[in-house]
Amino acid sequence: MKLPIYLDYSATTPVDPRVAEKIMQFMTMDGTFGNPASRSHRFGWQAEEAVDIARNQIADLVGADPREIVFTSGATESDNLAIKGAANFYQKKGKHIITSKTEHKAVLDTCRQLEREGFEVTYLAPQRNGIIDLKELEAAMRDDTILVSIMHVNNEIGVVQDIAAIGEMCRARGIIYHVDATQSVGKLPIDLSQLKVDLMSFSGHKIYGPKGIGALYVRRKPRVRIEAQMHGGGHERGMRSGTLPVHQIVGMGEAYRIAKEEMATEMERLRGLRNRLWNGIKDIEEVYLNGDLEHGAPNILNVSFNYVEGESLIMALKDLAVSSGSACTSASLEPSYVLRALGLNDELAHSSIRFSLGRFTTEEEIDYTIELVRKSIGRLRDLSPLWEMYKQGVDLNSIEWAHH
């Protein structure tokens, strides 16, 4: 077993060796390196064919028509293109958008930008388990609501929203529905031929593909329109200009092809490992599960260890690559906004660790993790005056702390 153990698959994944091998065939002079927009020679035609195959592989995994797949530089761009693109196109109908407080920053900050441009945004608070109450969503819908953006799987706590039900509600009212599926695609079944979802964002690097490539699904029937945010040569049906990075697209396509083949068995394996990890640590005193195992993605476990500071715990667990919060915001020392939205106090939010498992995680690694976590929590609590006071029965909330 190699140390450190990588348990941060929700931040990024290694590229699958099969994907890396494929990418290499589309880079050099003796490979297929042409520009797919070059219509006058074989180099361009071969590149275009490779892009078409990848587009089909991505559409295949999610039950879409390949013509509905628009390539972008990643899920952040897909979220921006979907939300700004739809808001700008449909603003004559209304200027009200609904999202949730636990969305990824790529959705929240895009909505904040639209607020500065005169749109009105309602941010729904989830229930304690992280799930959005559909009655609250319905109550928030107005005549001038043009867009709802609610993610499929949360990147920090792994809860799965009922996107099928939300889609039905939106379609019945003629509201565009965008789903950020970055954390769910290839891990949970998605069938866009059945779901009433209009726009869906995908990433390459969360599913063993390369970084820097993503896609946006844009429904054709009933037709959904978006305004381009990137202008140039009119690539991708005019929705996203820019020369297509064939090697990255081929890598993403291959990753999605593999995911389709292996998803069912991999889901069960990961769920087993996640449950093994939780069962191994849940009897530690003052341990809280954030989210909901029953309505949760099979690969994410978010746990708070009371009376232990999250940053010091991460230092103590130096043999494990884990995170407190998401990688995109873990550079700041603010407690996770997702956990705060669930109603956790600052202390519990600060003492949270996200374990995210993946294709190369083994049972041996999980057992080592359990042992290490148990040891580290014990050691850190031995050093903690707060833990000592708690064990003596002192109500820590009633203490007036001196402010210097």
Swiss-Prot record:
GO terms for cellular component: L-cysteine desulfurase complex. The modification N6-(pyridoxal phosphate)lysine is found at K206. The active site is at C328. Disulfide bonds: none annotated. Keywords: 2Fe-2S, Cytoplasm, Iron, Iron-sulfur, Metal-binding, Pyridoxal phosphate, Transferase. The keyword Cell cycle does not apply. Pyridoxal 5'-phosphate binds at A75, T76, N155, Q183, S203, G204, H205, T243. It comes from the Bacteria. Its main location: cytoplasm. [2Fe-2S] cluster binds at C328. GO terms for biological process: [2Fe-2S] cluster assembly. GO terms for molecular function: 2 iron, 2 sulfur cluster binding; cysteine desulfurase activity; metal ion binding; pyridoxal phosphate binding. Homodimer. Forms a heterotetramer with IscU, interacts with other sulfur acceptors. NCBIfam families: IscS, PRK02948.1, PRK14012.1. Belongs to the class-V pyridoxal-phosphate-dependent aminotransferase family. NifS/IscS subfamily. HAMAP family: Cys_desulf_IscS. Master enzyme that delivers sulfur to a number of partners involved in Fe-S cluster assembly, tRNA modification or cofactor biosynthesis. Catalyzes the removal of elemental sulfur and selenium atoms from cysteine and selenocysteine to produce alanine. Functions as a sulfur delivery protein for Fe-S cluster synthesis onto IscU, an Fe-S scaffold assembly protein, as well as other S acceptor proteins. Also functions as a selenium delivery protein in the pathway for the biosynthesis of selenophosphate. This is Cysteine desulfurase IscS. It comes from Escherichia fergusonii (strain ATCC 35469 / DSM 13698 / CCUG 18766 / IAM 14443 / JCM 21226 / LMG 7866 / NBRC 102419 / NCTC 12128 / CDC 0568-73). The gene is iscS.
